[in-house]
UniProtKB/Swiss-Prot annotation:
UniProt biased composition (Polar residues): 1-20
Positions of region (Disordered): 1-32
Organism: Vaccinia virus (strain Western Reserve) (VACV)
Identification of the protein by name: 7 kDa A-type inclusion protein
Length: 65
């Protein structure tokens, strides 16, 4: 069996270290206009309804007599 096609350990270490030191791409920084400002929240409040509340079942907390 011939060893000519099998890379030597030093070649393998070199190729791995070149890959390992490549920094990952930087994420896109959001622009300032992409953020929601506090003014837009105050001027456009979300409507609130009692039906949005989740009420507990009070019978679950009462002890049986």
């Amino acid at each position: 069996m011939s060893n000519q096609n099998i890379p030597q350990l030093s070649e393998y270490q070199t190729s791995v270290s070149q890959v390992a030191v490549t920094p990952p791409p930087k994420p896109k920084t959001p622009q300032i206009f992409e953020y929601q400002t506090s003014d837009s929240i105050v001027n456009n409040p979300r409507p609130f309804y009692n039906s949005d509340l989740e009420f507990d079942d009070i019978d679950m907390y009462l002890l049986p007599n």
